[in-house]
Structure formats: structure tokens, C-alpha cells
């Protein structure tokens, strides 16, 4: 993990642990040993049934960063989502706090509570379904290549996390792999033949899903 991001995660989790927060997003997938790539921000999420404590949790995290000598600007804040811009005077990073569905208790690791791998992967599937960024393709591809999850297992996790999950819409999202600019992948070190293979694997999955829908 990037050292500055590690500082932000440790400090944020130290303040928000009592509100049920855990490390989420790409770093949670990395903590599970499924992928290794640069990450742009730190995601800290709590469970849906603790959403009433969200505002207090955000305040606690902001105060913890300031007590740690960091400067914090709240860029956005709603009932269940907040985006902070945090700087040490040299670097600036986003910290996103939110509320999400989870099926399992977080796992306590050296950095603090981290989403259970099943929940981290389910959230990544939701991200791929909803926005289909390059990093979402990279994370899900790495998850599949790890051998710990099959395509069917990922679909099951996605459906459990989102009752509205539609395989046909997901198939459309997979088509974005060939539409995204190669530079979107290059910033994470995926280029040339590696990118071609990634796109090929998602194209195959897309065809399988569409074939299943037609049967």
C-alpha cells in the first residue's frame, strides 16, 4: 500500500472502527491477496444498518486527521457518503466514506478492519456493473485469475449484494472493456498483450452471458 494511503487508512479506521467502518474498495481486494495495483484513494465503508451513525463517523475521521497534523477539506457530504481531500502539505488524496451492504463481519488485519473478501469482491462486481472503470475490470480479472472465485461465484455474490442485478445489463457493462481508452488501463500497468488478453476474457464472458439469456 502507498505509505500516505496507509497513514490515511490507519488513522481513519482508528477513528471510525467503533462505527463499524472497514477498509473497502481496491485496497480491500488487495488485502485479500487478489490483486496488486496503484490506487487513487482510500475507501472506508460501514454497514447499512449503521447508517444513522454516519455523520458522527465522518466528524470523528475528520478530527482524527487534523489531530494527526493533516489538512482536511470536505468536498461532498450526504446522508450516507462523504468525500474528503486530505493533504500533508506535499501530497493530496481522496478519502471516501460510505455505507454499503455486507454479508460478513470485517476481518481484523494489521491496518485495521478490512472487508471480508466475499464482500470486497461483491462490491467490485457492483462497481463493474454500475460504472465499468478500467480499475474495476482489472480487479475482477485478477480475482478470477487467482482461482479463488469462478465467474458463477462472482455472479452469485453480485446478486446477493444487489437484488436488482441483471445479467444482461452486466453483459453490456462487460462490453466497455473494449471501449475504454488503452491509457485508462496503462495507468495501472496493463498494456499491450496483457490488455488484449484481459479484453478477450471479458468478451468471452459477455458472450456466455448473452447466450445464457437467449436459451
Model features per residue range: what roles?
Residues 1-215:
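Compositionally biased terminal segments of proteins
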Amino acid at each position: 500500500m502507498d505509505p500516505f494511503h496507509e497513514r490515511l487508512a490507519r488513522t481513519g479506521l482508528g477513528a471510525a472502527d467503533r462505527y463499524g467502518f472497514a477498509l473497502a474498495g481496491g485496497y480491500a481486494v488487495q488485502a485479500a491477496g487478489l490483486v496488486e495495483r496503484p490506487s487513487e484513494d482510500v475507501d472506508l465503508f460501514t454497514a447499512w444498518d449503521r447508517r444513522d451513525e454516519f455523520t458522527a463517523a465522518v466528524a470523528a475521521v475528520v478530527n482524527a486527521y487534523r489531530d494527526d497534523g493533516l489538512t482536511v477539506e470536505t468536498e461532498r457530504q450526504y446522508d450516507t457518503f462523504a468525500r474528503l481531500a486530505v493533504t500533508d502539505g506535499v501530497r493530496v488524496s481522496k478519502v471516501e466514506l460510505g455505507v454499503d451492504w455486507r454479508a460478513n463481519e470485517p476481518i481484523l488485519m494489521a491496518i485495521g478492519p478490512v472487508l471480508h473478501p466475499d464482500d470486497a469482491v461483491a462490491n467490485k462486481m457492483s462497481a463493474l456493473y454500475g460504472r465499468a472503470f478500467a480499475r474495476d475490470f482489472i480487479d475482477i480479472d485478477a480475482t478470477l485469475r487467482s482461482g479463488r472465485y469462478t465467474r458463477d461465484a462472482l455472479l452469485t455474490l453480485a446478486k446477493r449484494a444487489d437484488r436488482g442485478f441483471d445479467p444482461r445489463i452486466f453483459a453490456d457493462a462487460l462490453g466497455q472493456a473494449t471501449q475504454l481508452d488503452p491509457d485508462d488501463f496503462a495507468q495501472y500497468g496493463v498494456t499491450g498483450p496483457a490488455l488484449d488478453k484481459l479484453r478477450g476474457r471479458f468478451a468471452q464472458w459477455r458472450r456466455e452471458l448473452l447466450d445464457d439469456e437467449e436459451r
